[in-house]
Amino acid sequence: MSINSAMLAGVSGLIANSSALAAISDNIANVNTVGFKRSTSNFSTLVTSGNKNQTYSAGGVKAQTHQFISQQGLTQSTTSNLDISISGAGFFVTTEKPENLTATDTRSFTRAGSFQLDNLGYLRNDAGLYLQGWLADPVSGLITPDPSDLMQLASINVGSVGGTAEKTTRVGVNANLRSEQPVAAAVSYKVGTAGSPSKTNVVDSATNSHNYDVVYSSTGIANPVSGNNEYLVDIKENGVIVATGKVAYDAATNELVSSTIDYKGASPVTGSMTTTRINAAGTTVNLADLGIVNASGADDAEVVAGKLYDPSTWSMSDYAKDNSKGVKPDFEVQIPLSDSKGGQRTVTLSMLKGPGPNQWYAELRAKPGDLANNGNGQISTGIIEFTTDGKLKNTGSLFGTTSPTAITIKSSGYIAPTVTPPAVQPPTPPTWADALGIDEQEVQIDLASAAGGLTQYNSQSVVQSVNTNGTAFGNLTNIEIDEGGYVSAIFDNGVTRRIAQVAIATFSNPNGLKGVNGNAYRVTNESGTYSLKAPSQGGAGALAPSTLEASTVDLSQEFTGLITTQRAYSASSKIITTADQMLEELLNIKR
């Protein structure tokens, strides 16, 4: 009967508009929900089957809710470093629990990017869903996204990130060495010619200074030693001979063979003088050390002569440890180092003007006590050479190498491997002291890459800058998420460490997803399966840090929908009342 179908059509209109009202109400209620996607009710006709000759029967209307999940919401700035929004396609991957995840655990997808740290340090949004991503390798620190393997995703946790320290591996020095720096006495040889006096200053045990004239003579030897060159030696102070003797050199090796010094008022002493022959021709010799008595002639007095610079026995490192020993450097550069534990060490580059106009002796040393096997802290020694225009002869090198000098300090407790004879056991390399308990450290010292590098000009010796990497120990102060989805830990020593990368899931039909509690969605047959991607890769949207995606609800549109829905509902109710009145009239016929 057509009247009955009209009444049923009115009922369907009430139902459809009730559904539309529900969708509008849901939209209005979530106008401030982060990442909420509005929905609407679409109406479609219902047709009663029949032919054209039959009386028309109303079919009514059907409402179907449609979600605009793929619609982009406006981006709103926030003050939280953990707030993120997606600009473009994709969803955050989340789980309901943070740990012990398996492939069968349900994954939810959301655009709600307001995350906070829970009590265990996991990133969780306001709905209690845990953010998933690719974690950094604990050893290398590298993050390698693998979109093909769901189990590579894990809940992002920053609670396990402790303090950090990075050891120094590179050093750049910018300094100038004075080109007219006088050659130190410990470097210059005291040269004398046979028959001519050579001045030698010595200090006795009572710190009395004596100035001796040493005269060599190649004549007057009655019984010269076969194969050797012998010289008579006269040692005078203030014109008075205090000792006489002779020295003999091997003609082939130029090494001192023997020396006999006759002190006035004392018995002769054999082998108490050390000299070095400079010229193999036999006319020029050098007196480096004198083991002689003081001017009074007392044979039990101790006299110490000035020694020549020798990095292995009489070095600048020795002087740094004990000022009464070794050779005082002409210039030093302090280089700060961070060890593997974040401890702050200092390596000193000491330099001594060499005998050549463009030559300097150099030593690298640690603080005495920082090394286990070198009491004076010496690490490395060598020579620095410059060109005539004041540049390093070998660009970037320290000791004449063609590349930046590398020093290696072995770890605390290092034990050198033994070799099998006849192989010779190499010297033990510099090693950190056992008490420090720190790792091996290799440091590249570059003297050219730093601005200006190391130069030798006729101006004051000065350090312009020393640049190093590495940091002291630092505590975690902040967490940030950048445009690439990298979650980074920031420490108070200036170090930033990436700990994870946020994963983005995309769908071929995101509007086919099924909504669940917490402003999240689940996979359906209509949506298709998801594809994991890094932000801004493969069609995935980019992340916007410190922002949130606003709800896509437009209140003006929703209120307009309320009016039309209310009118439609009222009109549908009129259909029912009208049909009812017509049926009433039909019943009145019988009266």
Curated annotation (Swiss-Prot):
The record's subcellular location field reads: Bacterial flagellum basal body
- InterPro entries, from UniProt? Flag_bb_rod_N (IPR001444), Flagellar_basal_body_rod (IPR053592), Flagellar_basal_body_rod_CS (IPR019776), Flagellar_FlgE/F/G (IPR020013), Flg_bb/hook_C_dom (IPR010930), FlgE/F/G-like (IPR037925), FlgE_D2 (IPR011491), FlgE_third (IPR055069)
The name this protein carries in UniProt is: Flagellar hook protein FlgE
GO biological process terms held by the UniProt record: bacterial-type flagellum-dependent swarming motility
Name where it mostly resides: other
One Pfam family assigned to this protein is: Flg_bbr_C
- Please give the superkingdom of this protein's source: Bacteria
Q: Which UniProt keywords apply?
A: Bacterial flagellum
Its family remark reads:
Belongs to the flagella basal body rod proteins family.
Organism whose genome encodes this protein? Caulobacter vibrioides (strain ATCC 19089 / CIP 103742 / CB 15)
Any one Gene Ontology cellular component term annotated for this protein: cytosol
